[in-house]
Design a protein with these regions (language model features):
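Histidine-acidic metal/acid-base catalytic patches
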Residues: 2-46, 51, 55-67, 133-135, ...
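Active-site acidic/histidine proton-transfer and metal-coordination neighborhood
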Residues: 12-17, 37-39, 79, 108-210, ...
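Active-site-proximal loop/turn and secondary-structure-junction residues that shape catalytic pockets
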Residues: 51-53, 79, 103-106, 143-145, ...
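Catalytic domains of carbohydrate-active enzymes, especially glycoside hydrolases
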Residues: 61-79
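Anion (oxyanion) recognition and catalysis
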Residues: 66, 91, 130, 169, ...
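Glycine-rich, proline-tolerant flexible connector loops at the mouths of alpha/beta enzymes
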Residues: 75-91
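Mid-chain, structured segments of secreted extracytoplasmic proteins
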Residues: 90-117
Length: 296
C-alpha cells in the first residue's frame, strides 16, 4: 500500500496523541525546577537590584537575590545608599558586590571641563568600593556635546580615563567603560558599540581600565556578539546582559544566550555577569531564564 506524504503528515498528530506510550510524552516534573535557579553551574550571575525587586527596601532585595541563588549583586549610583548596611548584608550572606556606577551620564566625561570633577569622583568612588569590597565600577562616557564630533568626544574620554587610571591602579578598582545603544534606550549618547570602546580602552592602555560589555546594548548596536567578543576580549572587564526586544531576562527575546555564554566561557571569562534586565514575570520565574541560558 502506498501512503502519500500528505496522509502521513495528517496522521502524525493523531498518532502522537493516541498511540505514543505515556513514557514518551513530555511531562512537567516539579523536581526538574531548580530551587535556586540563579545558582548556575558555569556562569556567575549578579542580580541588578535596581531592576529586580524594585518595590522592596534595598536590603530586602539583596536577601531575595540570595534566596534565588545569586552569588552577587550590582547596582547603579552608590551615593544615597547605606554602604555600611550593604557591606554587612552581603558579608552575612556570603555575596559579592560585583560592580556599581562610579560615574554616570552627566556631567559628561567627554568634555575636558568635567575632568577635574571626574577624577575627584573616582577617588570618592574608590573609597566606596573599598567599603563594599568591590573591585569594579562602571564609568559612562556622556551624551553628545553640541559642536563636537564623535571622534573629539572619544578623545576627551580617553584623556579623562588616563587621568583616573593611576587612581584605579593604586586602589585596585577597575574602571569599566560602558558603551550604550542609541536605537532604543539612549538616543544621543556618544559611545555605542564595542568597537569604539575597545579603541578607547586600548588607547588608555591601563590594566585597570576596561569595558563593561553589555551584551544587550551591543546586540542592538552592532550584532555579531560572539565575533566582537572574540575581537575585543583583551579589553573586556565585566559583562552584563538582557534579552531583546524588551530588555527582559534571557529566553524572552531573540538573543541565543546559551551560545553567547558558551563563547564567553571558551574565551576564558570567569567573572560575574550582571543581570541588568527587567523581569517579565515574577523574579523566581524570570530567574529560570538564567538557568536555561547556562545550559550548553
Amino acid at each position: 500500500m502506498t501512503i502519500s506524504r500528505r496522509a502521513l503528515l495528517a496522521a502524525a498528530p493523531a498518532a502522537a496523541l493516541t498511540g505514543a506510550p505515556a513514557s514518551s510524552r513530555p511531562t512537567q516534573d516539579p523536581a526538574a525546577r531548580p530551587a535556586k535557579p540563579a545558582a548556575t553551574p558555569k556562569t556567575r550571575f549578579a542580580a541588578n537590584v535596581e531592576m529586580w525587586w524594585g518595590g522592596l527596601p534595598f536590603l530586602d532585595r539583596i536577601q531575595k537575590a540570595h534566596e534565588l541563588g545569586f552569588p552577587a549583586i550590582e547596582f547603579w549610583p552608590w551615593r544615597g545608599k547605606d554602604l555600611a548596611a550593604i557591606a554587612k548584608k552581603t558579608k552575612e550572606l556570603g555575596m559579592t558586590v560585583a560592580q556599581f556606577t562610579g560615574w554616570g551620564f552627566s556631567p559628561g566625561l567627554n568634555e575636558a571641563k568635567n575632568h577635574v570633577a571626574f577624577v575627584a569622583e573616582i577617588e570618592a568612588s574608590c573609597k566606596a568600593a573599598k567599603q563594599l569590597d568591590c573591585t569594579r565600577m562602571t564609568v559612562v562616557g556622556g551624551n553628545d556635546v553640541q559642536g563636537m564630533t564623535q571622534a573629539q568626544m572619544h578623545e576627551q574620554i580617553i584623556a579623562g580615563l588616563k587621568l583616573a587610571a593611576p587612581i584605579a591602579e593604586r586602589e585596585g578598582v577597575m574602571l569599566i567603560l560602558e558603551p550604550m545603544n542609541i536605537r532604543v534606550d539612549h538616543k544621543g549618547h556618544c559611545l555605542y558599540g564595542s568597537e569604539a570602546a575597545v579603541r578607547i580602552c586600548r588607547a588608555v592602555g591601563s590594566p585597570m581600565v576596561k569595558i563593561n560589555w553589555d551584551l544587550y546594548h551591543c546586540h542592538i548596536s552592532e550584532g555579531d556578539l560572539c565575533g566582537h567578543l572574540h575581537d575585543g576580549f583583551d579589553q573586556l572587564g565585566y559583562v552584563q546582559l538582557a534579552d531583546h526586544p524588551g530588555r527582559t531576562e534571557p529566553g524572552t527575546g531573540e538573543i541565543h544566550y546559551p551560545r553567547v555564554l558558551q563563547e564567553l566561557h571558551a574565551l576564558g571569562y570567569r567573572g560575574f555577569v550582571g543581570v541588568e534586565c527587567n523581569p517579565s514575570k515574577p523574579e523566581a520565574d524570570a530567574a529560570l531564564g538564567l538557568w536555561h541560558a547556562d545550559q550548553w
